[in-house]
Amino acid sequence: TTIKLNDKMIFSYPKICYIPSERNFVAGVPNFSKYNEGNNVLLYFAYDWSEAKEDIKKLDISNLLSREVSYENINDKDYIFDNGSKLLLTNASSGVQSVLPLYQTIIYMLSNLYKKQRALSPSKEMARKDFANEMIMVANRIADGENISNFKKHSNILISMFKMLESYDVKAINKFSDLPPKELSHNIYEAVHVLDRLFNYHFTQLFIEEPEQNLFPDTQQEFVYWLLEIMQNDKKHAAIITTHSPYILFALNNCMMGGLVRDNIPEEEVSDFASHSAWINPKLVSVFELDNGTLRCVQDEDGIIEDNYLNTAYKKNSEEYLELLNYYEDEE
């Protein structure tokens, strides 16, 4: 495998997480992650969520559901505390079974995952350590004055590394003698350090399917606001969301409009808007609809969402209701 670095930027390795619409099925089946038959995204999500639950034993989800609801893992069993009532997750409402794995997995993948060292398989970890130790040994011996001709078997590997990892701290050379010994030694150290970063995740790429499933419109809106807020950090996380809900798009539009007019709003009025912590530059967002197998962008020149299939269907229903309302006679 060849890794090419563009614009002198170090390669960033993503953690990819797919959250399927069937997540409430995973939540409704005890110990689902222990099943290993087949090779599908539902199982991969079960493994990701299981990893999240290992790390997050307690979680308050009240802010999304607008009522007192929390999760706790007790003796390896998942419990929900709903307005004081304790019940197994498998017996909870479909809304809770849908939002908990969504919420818990996202928190872990965007935040908690990066608070610990990534665990590699034993074979990969051994290979990483052996390679790093050998290259550092070469760097130390060169720094101590040993003749570079003694490292012919390492030169091709290291020169290829230098070219692959060329950045501000790693210099690309054609042969060892292109650099003084001390500088060559330093170059090896830097290359090993940069290469070591390739084993760690640098950002998360989320694929979220139907976040609106089993959720009230208010909860859908709160989810969008929360997601955009938690994604705003130095990791440069990304998300691809598929939806059939106009409420998801309405909430996203609020966030983009807020990002567009932020500088025009008096500071003391910013917090009056529910979406203020999730405002985002519309240029960072792309919105498409699928029409007869063709993708069509539904944003205007400012990036704001224009009329689309979901919005049109919503308006059509509203218009019919208003027409019928003309024939309604209030007996009072």
Feature roles, as predicted:
Residues 1-203, 278, 286, 293-297, ...:
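Phosphate-coordinating catalytic segments in nucleotide- and nucleic-acid-processing enzymes
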Residues 194, 218-332:
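C-terminal lobe/lid and adjacent interdomain/linker elements of RecA-like ASCE P-loop ATPase modules
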Residues 205-207:
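Walker B motif beta-strand of ABC-family P-loop ATPases
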Residues 209-211:
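Walker B catalytic acidic pair
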